Design a protein with these regions (language model features):
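PRPP-associated nucleotide enzymes
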Residues: 1-82, 86-140
Length: 140
C-alpha cells in the first residue's frame, strides 16, 4: 500500500473512494494513512442512506453501483478511486461518472488508481478518453 499512498499524495487527493469490494482493502489503508475521508461505491441496496446510482454494462451483463448522497464531496475535491483491477474500465468509469455527474467534480480531478491493469482489454485507453486520470502498479 505504500506505493498507492505515495501516488495519492502526489496527486494531492483529498478523498479516497473505492469500488466494492477488494478495493476496500487498499483504499481503507490509504485513507487511514493520509487521514482522508473514505467513500464507498457499492452494489445496490448495500448502503444505509439515500444514494445516487449508475448503471453500466459488463462483458457478461449489466449492473449498477451506488454512492450515498450525504457524502461530503465538493466540486473542487480531488478524488482517488482505488480498485484492485482494471479490465475493460467499465466499473471504474461508472464510479468516476457517478462522482462527476452527481457531485460536479471535474473529470481531471478524478484519479483511478489500480493495482493491476489488463492492457489488452483496453480499460486504460477508455478511461483516458473519458477525461479521467489513471495510474496502475502493474500492467499485464
Amino acid at each position: 500500500c505504500d506505493e498507492l499512498t505515495k501516488i495519492t499524495k502526489k496527486f494531492d487527493g483529498n478523498i479516497v473512494a473505492s469500488i466494492e469490494s477488494r478495493g476496500f482493502i487498499f483504499a481503507g489503508t490509504i485513507a487511514r494513512d493520509l487521514g482522508l475521508p473514505f467513500v464507498l461505491a457499492r452494489k445496490p441496496g448495500k448502503l444505509p442512506n439515500e444514494t445516487y446510482k449508475k448503471s453500466f454494462d459488463l462483458e457478461y451483463g449489466s449492473t449498477s453501483i451506488e454512492i450515498q448522497k450525504n457524502t461530503q464531496i465538493k466540486p473542487n475535491d480531488k478524488i482517488v478511486i482505488v480498485d484492485d483491477l482494471v479490465a475493460t474500465g467499465g466499473t471504474a468509469i461508472a464510479c468516476a461518472e457517478l462522482l462527476s455527474e452527481n457531485f460536479n467534480v471535474k473529470n481531471s480531478n478524478i484519479l483511478i488508481l489500480s493495482i493491476i491493469n489488463l492492457e489488452d482489454l483496453g480499460g486504460r485507453k477508455l478511461i483516458q478518453e473519458k477525461g479521467f486520470l489513471i495510474e496502475t502498479l502493474v500492467d499485464y
